[in-house]
Amino acid sequence: MATSDSQSQQGTTVPDREVAKHVFAAELNEATYTFKTSQDERAPVYVALPTGVRANRVCVMGTVTDVEDVGTDDQEYLRVRVVDPTGTFWVYAGQYQHEALKKLKKIQPPEFLAVIGKPRTYKTDDGTINVSLVPEDIGVVDISTRDIWVFEAARRTLERVESARETSPKVAALAREQYGHDGSYFAHVAAFALQNLLDGDESATELDAETIEERLEEAEAKGDDVDGEEPEQETLIED
């Protein structure tokens, strides 16, 4: 499963398979704005993450709390609720996600699940825009792997909070315009997730408490010391 976040955000040349971003549920659920970088109908669709980068693919982990078939009598369509320390991911799989569908049918809550998938937005009857995940690769993981993901997702979130205005100024400007803030709040979200990791009675992480506490201090410091400078503006193509 590809999990690295190391990828340039600028330019219009897009690889066939982009690297997955580590994103907490709290941030992904706010990433309701989609865009393309090309008029080509086959161009990838991105969500603008509130922390200021684009994402065509994400890597998430959490506890499965519910698996429900919301399809028709003759066609399965599974909706899976996956919870991380910050919120809920909704994963949907049907006939076009055949391998993921087979695996999801075997899931027994409350197993820990890793998902690499594409974010998709949809509008509800009342006009609310929600975000879900279309899975490309999934797998059951142990609690240690889940804990390491929480730590890594916090690290990646803090990197975006600190550097997105420099490394991806165009998307950072777009995100600020769409969501009305610069994403610095998610440093506090990262801190909350790390504190949850420290407090968890069931935690079996290979990370020692001192390492987690150091990252927690960094998260709290970033949350309290954020540059309010306006990012550079850009026009991108709405999906």
Which residues are covered by each model-predicted region?
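OB/S1-fold single-stranded nucleic-acid-binding modules
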Residues: 1-50, 54, 192-239
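Short acidic (Asp/Glu) patches
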Residues: 44, 93-103
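A general secondary-structure signal for short beta-strands and their flanking turns/coil
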Residues: 55-57, 75-77, 112, 128
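OB-fold (S1/OB) nucleic-acid-binding surfaces
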Residues: 69-97, 137, 141
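Hydrophobic residues positioned within well-ordered beta-strands of beta-sheet architectures
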Residues: 60, 78-80, 115
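Extended, charge-rich, solvent-exposed interface segments
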Residues: 98-99, 106-112, 118, 124-217, ...
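Structural detector for short beta-strands of small beta-barrel domains
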Residues: 55-74
